[in-house]
């Protein structure tokens, strides 16, 4: 009955666009700290033992008193719970986590209402949730395009921009004021969050709230951009024997005009439809148009961010590149359009001809340098790529050590399965294999050679090639490959995030 009452109150608040009272409800904090919804935050902060129901009740009691809404982080008396001193910002952290759940409510309800009656249609497109679905799209479209804009989406230069972007959707003024309080409450924050240190601190402070605000900011920008892209499929042009210049960005004319008694037809040029993909803060805009058109798109983005979001984006954050001469560094892959030429001999009666056939191919390559840097940062090798033992794992059992190394290899193999050239991936797996052997030999106070000689070289080889053997059983083999392992390209439809070693910056 209490759960039903809570849902009814939630619905009434949604009807009136009024979410501020929900901050006083206990079930909001239950949602915020449920391990299924907020597992990453619990694992990082390791403070779940102190977020008990009694702590939540004490927090809500203090919230009812205006004097305790703003909690001093330096007052040790206010911050004592159950006789010990927790983190300085325990209560403030709890409020921000609960508020992050509250601001997601209207958008979750809008999503549910938009999906009502469309279960069958949505069910067919669930595979599009995988980030690997981007690469088949790039393979199909980028082969026929000329230029690409490599865009780094700028962060808002002021915290108030995030609030102003949200206020068009969230009509509750009290909630907006509370959001401002959370954003400016931290002493370590400045009025600008453009530096990498400030962004990192904001993520650690409240990852869920930060991701919501940033994703909403990006979605607002993309909403306007998609509208522009749909309207710019046709551009109005004037011509007098030659194309002079586009004078409007929207609309088109479908009639004739008289210029000096000569009938001049207004030419209609269909704009090369641009293709847009984005992951996190990096986006790609590719088109079949000319270099002049791409420069117009570039400066449109700069002026658009400046005018609509008060965000200054430097021109060097947007690069114009020709696809035939450029490798895209996107989502952990190096991708490029490669030309494959083949010579075909054609015989016609007594004459023979040599025909050169040029075919485009979209290549996805595993970048070796960033991955070696990530492995060196994680202490699996040095900066030159020479494997070293993971000393902090020597206290674990042999099976746990092998399982951890094997899990990393499986994740990397799983993510880079669509690479057209896997030589670099095998180098990374070789580094991890020797690092595992060095870790085990260090634990048993032996040398790597003696350890492998005692257990056999197949001890680790079979384990680290497990996924390739599974693929070779369910997919056709390439007779030219050795060992019977599968060397083809596979894109998985169950990958929703990039592995930490892939996404390390």
UniProtKB/Swiss-Prot annotation:
A single MF term (Gene Ontology): RNA binding
User: Source organism's superkingdom?
Assistant: Eukaryota
| Native species | Froelichia floridana (Florida snake-cotton)
Q: Which Pfam families match?
A: Intron_maturas2, MatK_N
Q: Where, per UniProt, does this protein localize?
A: Plastid, Chloroplast
Instruction: Describe the task this protein carries out.
Output: Usually encoded in the trnK tRNA gene intron. Probably assists in splicing its own and other chloroplast group II introns.
Q: Which GO terms describe its cellular component?
A: chloroplast
UniProt entry keywords in alphabetical sequence = Chloroplast, mRNA processing, Plastid, RNA-binding, tRNA processing
In Gene Ontology terms, what is a biological process of this protein? Answer: mRNA processing
**Record protein name field:** Maturase K
């Amino acid at each position: 009955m209490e759960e039903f009452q809570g849902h009814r109150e939630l619905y009434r608040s949604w009807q009136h666009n009024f979410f501020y009272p929900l901050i006083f409800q206990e079930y909001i904090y239950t949602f915020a700290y449920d391990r299924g919804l907020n597992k990453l935050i619990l694992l990082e902060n390791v403070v779940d033992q102190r977020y008990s129901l009694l702590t939540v009740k004490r927090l809500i009691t203090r919230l009812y008193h205006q004097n305790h809404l703003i909690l001093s982080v330096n007052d040790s008396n206010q911050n004592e719970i159950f006789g010990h001193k927790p983190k300085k910002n325990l209560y403030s952290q709890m409020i921000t986590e609960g508020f992050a759940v509250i601001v997601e409510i209207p958008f979750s309800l809008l999503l549910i209402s938009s999906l009502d009656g469309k279960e069958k249609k949505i069910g067919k497109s669930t595979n599009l949730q995988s980030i690997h679905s981007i690469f088949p799209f790039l393979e199909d479209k980028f082969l026929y395009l000329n230029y690409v804009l490599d865009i780094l989406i700028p962060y808002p230069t002021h915290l108030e921009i995030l609030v102003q972007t949200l206020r068009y959707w969230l009509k509750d003024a009290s909630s907006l004021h509370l959001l401002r309080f959370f954003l400016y409450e931290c002493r370590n924050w400045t009025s600008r969050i453009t530096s990498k240190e400030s962004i990192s601190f904001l993520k650690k402070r409240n990852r869920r709230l930060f991701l919501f605000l940033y994703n909403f900011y990006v979605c607002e920008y993309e909403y306007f951009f998609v509208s522009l892209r749909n309207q710019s499929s046709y551009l109005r042009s004037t011509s007098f024997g030659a194309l002079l210049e586009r004078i409007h960005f929207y609309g088109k004319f479908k009639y004739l005009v008289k210029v000096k008694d000569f009938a001049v037809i207004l030419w209609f040029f269909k704009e090369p439809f641009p293709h847009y993909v984005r992951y996190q803060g990096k986006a790609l805009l590719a088109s079949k148009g000319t270099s002049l058109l791409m420069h117009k798109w570039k400066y449109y983005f700069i002026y658009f961010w400046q005018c609509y979001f008060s965000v200054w984006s430097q021109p060097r954050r947007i690069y114009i590149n020709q696809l035939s001469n450029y490798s895209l560094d996107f989502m952990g892959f190096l991708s490029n359009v490669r030309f494959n030429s083949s010579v075909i001999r054609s015989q016609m009666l007594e004459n023979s001809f040599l025909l050169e056939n040029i075919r485009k191919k979209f290549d996805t390559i595993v970048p070796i340098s960033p991955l070696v840097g990530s492995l060196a940062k994680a202490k699996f090798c040095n900066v030159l790529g020479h494997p070293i033992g993971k000393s902090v794992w020597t206290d674990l059992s042999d099976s746990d050590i092998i399982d951890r190394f094997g899990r990393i290899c499986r994740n990397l193999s799983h993510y880079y399965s669509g690479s057209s050239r896997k030589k670099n991936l095998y180098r990374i797996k070789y580094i991890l294999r020797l690092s595992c052997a060095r870790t085990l030999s260090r634990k048993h106070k032996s040398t790597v050679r003696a350890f492998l000689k005692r257990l056999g070289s197949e001890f680790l080889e079979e384990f680290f090639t497990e996924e390739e053997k599974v693929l070779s059983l369910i997919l056709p083999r390439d007779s030219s490959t050795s060992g019977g392992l599968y060397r083809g390209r596979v894109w998985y439809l169950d990958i929703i995030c990039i592995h930490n070693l892939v996404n390390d910056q």
